[in-house]
A protein has these predicted regions:
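A glycine-centered beta-loop-beta connector
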Residues: 28, 36-52, 102, 110-125
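Tandem CBS (Bateman) regulatory domains
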Residues: 1-11, 49-87, 99-103, 123-140
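Short, charge-rich amphipathic segments
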Residues: 29-37, 56-59, 63
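The conserved cystathionine-beta-synthase
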Residues: 15-32, 38-40, 88-106, 113, ...
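Context-gated lysine
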Residues: 2, 9, 16, 43, ...
Length: 140
């Protein structure tokens, strides 16, 4: 049975709590990514998703900045909108269990953590691509 460790992406593009939202939006566009674990050293302390960024304008901390009409994203920080209760998985987690976990928590990615350190990330898209590749091998 395939595990998360076999499907995950590594190294992981991460954010720090003190990064500006403007920097993160730029990084998201450059890398075509929508999930950024927020780390302190190697430890995951939060996560920013494309949904977090879309909803940032309604978050009180960022909304107040938007009212100022002054480069609000340059002054808003990742830590103001990051999700702090991060659902993670160890590399040996079976893919089927990862899918169940993502569905149960209605999340689109799982940071992969080993011994408390971030080692990779797996997204719903990664799992779908892997499933499609497996199906193609079976048929072909």
């Amino acid at each position: 049975m395939k595990t998360v460790g076999q499907v995950m992406k590594s190294p992981v593009v991460t954010a720090k709590a003190g990064d500006t939202l403007a920097d993160l939006v730029t990084l998201s566009r450059q890398r075509h990514m929508g999930h950024f674990p927020v780390v302190e050293g190697d430890k995951v302390i939060g996560i920013i998703t494309d949904r977090s960024l879309r909803e940032a304008s309604t978050h009180p901390a960022v909304y107040n900045l938007l009212l100022d009409l002054l480069a609000s994203l340059d002054r808003g920080l990742v830590e103001q909108i990051m999700i702090r209760d991060v659902i993670t998985a160890p590399p040996e987690t079976p893919v089927v269990d990862a899918v169940k976990l993502m569905r149960e928590h209605r999340i689109g990615c799982l940071p992969v953590v080993k011994d408390g350190k971030l080692v990779g990330i797996v997204t719903a898209s990664d799992l779908l691509w892997d499933l499609a590749a497996q199906e193609g091998q079976r048929q072909g």
